Amino acid sequence: MAEAAVASTVTLPVTGGWTKHVTCRYFMHGLCKEGDNCRYSHDLTSSKPAAMMCKFFQKGNCVFGERCRFEHCKPTKSEEVSNPQMLLLSSTPPPIDPECSESGPRLKTQDWANAAEFVPGQPYCGRAESVDVEISIPLIEELNGDATTDKEELRKQLCPYAAVGECRYGVNCAYLHGDVCDMCGLQVLHPTDSSQRSEHTKACIEAHEKDMEISFAIQRSKDMMCGVCMEVVFEKANPSERRFGILSNCSHCYCLKCIRKWRSAKQFESKIIKSCPECRITSNFVIPSEYWVEDKEDKQKLIQKYKDGMGRKPCRYFDEGRGICPFGANCFYKHAFPDGRLEEAQPQRRQTGSSSRNRNSRRTQLWDIIDERESTGSLDNDDEEMVTFELSEMLLMLLAAGNDEEVTDSEDEWDLFHEELDDFYEIYL
């Protein structure tokens, strides 16, 4: 009994301290929560832990950076080349003795009773099927062939970096560096693809023509002087005022601010302020433009572009078919239903009746429309002149709709319209 007690006292320290010879794997990564109370060893000098490489760093997308607890090191080239082959070879069964392999096909048709006898120390050949060692060699060659094919495909594609500037890889780039385009000076022309070369050349020529048009427009506009303020429009201190006001029926130059101020004057008659300050030719509206336009054909294109731009905006009075637009077919805005259908133009019907009560009621409708416009907010500067022209046409239409006489175009009617419109809406006529 005494000997057993002594033996037990001797063996206790051994059973309790063997863990101190094992390095704590949590401490190796800095994650041990036990600290000094840990049963395992925290001494790294006696242990050589295997380096755990960060697989995300090898793929180039480790978000922890320097704070990552795994090792950031790129695999060597020998590892990159050998790893696929090692995985491929390890997945194939080991080579078998030819004598054993010969019996493999026969085992498919023979009974298990005739299987080869198991001999300790030698590979068992009873259930093993014949494996052709030559199969693994074409697989490796196929792997290398796929890599070669990928490189060949990359060599057929233009380098995206060289196409927009400079490629830092130079001659070592895996992509193809195209020929330099004479128009844009970039390496974007494929050496062998003729269709790509022709398409890019065509696109370059179109872009060059647009740039030339802008250059000519700037050259034509840089010295133009406003006929009211006598300042060069392109040299105005406020950049927002460097815009031209193109009159629809006149070729005199004015800045947009001055011509709108001229057309908003109240001390002159409407025909005077609607006319050009120099030649007195009447223009229905003013078109804002960044560049000066004088040629008649270019001016028509500008007017059409201006109307097309307004035609893409939905009419607030039509309201996708829920409302009624007082301008009807003469409205420059878009009359479209929710499903995309456009409103069909309706023929105008002439109403009879010459009583002053009917005429006054139609005038009241006009001022109600102006009040509604004023309550919803002011228009954009680009829309003011066109809306003014629309309102003037509607006024004449309403004045003429109440009788069978000729259309009234007196100065009193027009001045009344002009004064009320300025008071309610502050639009430049």
UniProtKB/Swiss-Prot annotation:
It comes from the Eukaryota. A zinc finger (RING-type) spans 226-280. InterPro entries: MKRN-like, MKRN1_C, Znf-CCCH_4, Znf_CCCH, Znf_CCCH_sf, Znf_RING, Znf_RING/FYVE/PHD, Znf_RING_CS. The keyword Chloroplast does not apply. Gene3D superfamilies: 3.30.1370.210, Pneumovirus matrix protein 2 (M2), zinc-binding domain, Zinc/RING finger domain, C3HC4 (zinc finger). Its EC number is 2.3.2.27. Residues 181-208 are annotated as: Makorin-type Cys-His. SUPFAM superfamilies: CCCH zinc finger, RING/U-box. Residues 348-358 have a biased composition (Low complexity). It catalyses: S-ubiquitinyl-[E2 ubiquitin-conjugating enzyme]-L-cysteine + [acceptor protein]-L-lysine = [E2 ubiquitin-conjugating enzyme]-L-cysteine + N(6)-ubiquitinyl-[acceptor protein]-L-lysine. Keywords: Metal-binding, Repeat, Transferase, Ubl conjugation pathway, Zinc, Zinc-finger. A zinc finger (C3H1-type) spans 18-45, 48-75, 153-180, 309-338. This is Probable E3 ubiquitin-protein ligase makorin-1. It comes from Takifugu rubripes (Japanese pufferfish).
